[in-house]
A protein has these predicted regions:
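Intrinsically disordered, low-complexity regulatory segments
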Residues: 1-161, 165
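Prokaryote-biased recognition of long, low-complexity C-terminal linker/tail segments
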Residues: 5, 164-213
């Protein structure tokens, strides 16, 4: 089985527990396992300029930019590790995978993007643990779940990523054009900034008052 963790440190911890102690270039091997890792997001949603050359310039008339078919990119500094994972997935002795990325929405997305970008069709299971203690890892491998059990989690993560893209790309370009300087807008960033601004305004307008208890 090929086990894919979210980062090298987690992969090393898992490998130590399941007996994959032989170090290779970009992965570890042993006891019937291959253990490798992502480096955060190996695959990301492509920027607007990937869809059309004219989107590389920020113009009001091009808004909104609404992709009909989402495209993905692999950053140059992460291509080597992606190629390693894809190569491992294609090995004939790999009959299945274990998704061992972080137990959460974002971890699910990181694995699924790599899995799909690599064109892998092999079945996978999910390791869902919240502790990297040896006992927790052993227990997690004893209770692996079918990967399909987490399809809805992946869909929610994908929806979040696409929503961030649509709001970030379009709103940032719109307000930057209107204000004639870069003004970033984000689905989470901007409401959070509003909370801070409101709080600062209250602090600035505070006036001392006498009161009695």
């Amino acid at each position: 089985q090929l086990v894919i963790a979210e980062k090298p440190s987690v992969a090393r911890s898992i490998a130590g527990v399941i007996g994959a102690d032989k170090k290779q270039d970009g992965y570890m091997e042993g006891n019937g396992y291959l253990v490798s890792w992502c480096i955060g997001h190996l695959v990301s949603l492509a920027d607007a300029g990937t869809y059309d050359e004219r989107f590389k310039k920020w113009r009001y008339d091009d808004l909104p930019i609404l992709p009909q078919q989402w495209q993905y990119i692999i950053p140059n500094d992460k291509k080597k590790q992606f190629d390693t994972l894809r190569s491992l997935m294609k090995r004939p002795d790999v009959t299945g995978l274990v998704c061992a990325t972080d137990a959460g929405r974002e971890g699910e997305l990181i694995f699924r993007f790599v899995y799909q970008m690599a064109g892998c069709k092999k079945p996978f299971q999910r390791l869902w643990i919240s502790s990297m203690e040896d006992a927790a890892i052993k227990d997690g491998f004893a209770h692996l779940k079918p990967g399909t059990d987490y399809d809805n989690l992946y869909q929610s993560a994908l929806c979040r990523a696409q929503a961030d893209w649509l709001v970030g790309i379009n709103a940032t370009r719109l307000f930057s054009i209107l204000y004639h300087k870069t003004l970033t807008v984000g689905r989470v960033q901007t409401p959070t900034l509003k909370i801070l601004v409101d709080r600062e305004a209250k602090i600035s307008s505070f006036q001392k008052e006498k009161y009695h208890i």
